[in-house]
Design a protein with these regions (language model features):
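Aromatic-anchored glycine-rich loop motif in surface-exposed flexible loops
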Residues: 1-78, 82
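Extracytoplasmic/secreted envelope proteins and their assembly/folding machinery
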Residues: 7, 18, 62, 66-69, ...
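Secretory-pathway/luminal and periplasmic proteins that interact with or process carbohydrate-rich
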Residues: 17-28, 103, 120-127
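Well-ordered alpha-helical segments within folded domains of soluble proteins
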Residues: 40-43, 92-99, 142-145
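Helix N-cap and loop-to-helix transition residues
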Residues: 54-57, 89, 125
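Hydrophobic-face positions in mid-chain alpha helices that act as interaction patches
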Residues: 87, 105, 111-188
């Protein structure tokens, strides 16, 4: 893949992460735009700026999310993750943007983005959804997913999930090397 694709995927992944973080650490968008949410960290910040980074407002976080998704949509235009579905592509970006617009109660924009997200997909038939379903990323209706196999686990402990090796609560996570991470949590 080209650097353009990698950059688009990185922006989409950051938007996805902030979309989840802002929902976990603050009330939803409408009516709470000025409430403090989470700090925003970007690649343009210096180390000093990252370490002295106050919590951004909900509005600022959503502005960052939409900026990242808009850039990602441009960079990933025409890119399709194919049958593997383990990479962020243009359809996934529009799906994420639809979700962000729903949370901001921008219903018309959400509908447009959702239409763009599913335009290349194949909805499941009534017969398909009448049996246990939504359990395989190989389904035509899935936009993004990872097919977990014994060959693609990210750690050798038998735990096969993405955040398991990033967690600071484990002795084996990458973030466990940050000894004073919890002392830096803003309690305001």
């Amino acid at each position: 893949a080209s650097l353009k694709i990698y950059r688009g995927q990185a922006l989409a992944a950051r938007a996805y992460d902030y979309l989840n973080l802002v929902q976990i650490y603050q009330f939803t968008y409408a009516g709470h735009e000025n409430a403090l949410a989470v700090p925003i960290v970007t690649e343009k910040m210096s180390d000093e700026e990252m370490h002295n980074n106050p919590r951004a407002t909900v509005q600022q976080v959503y502005d960052q999310i939409m900026s990242d998704l808009n850039q990602a949509a441009e960079l990933l235009a025409g890119f399709d993750n194919g049958a593997n579905k383990d990479q962020l592509d243009e359809a996934v970006v529009y799906g994420l943007r639809a979700r962000a617009n729903l949370l901001m109660q921008k219903w018309a924009d959400a509908a447009k983005d959702a239409e763009r997200a599913i335009a290349g997909g194949t909805p499941q038939s009534l017969a398909e959804v009448s049996t246990p379903t939504f359990n395989s990323a190989t389904a035509n209706s899935w936009l993004w997913g990872v097919m977990i196999t014994p060959d693609n686990d990210v750690v050798q402990t038998g735990i096969i999930n993405w955040p398991s090796h990033l967690c600071s609560l484990t002795g084996n996570g990458y973030t466990s090397g940050v000894p004073d991470g919890y002392r830096k949590v803003n309690t305001d």
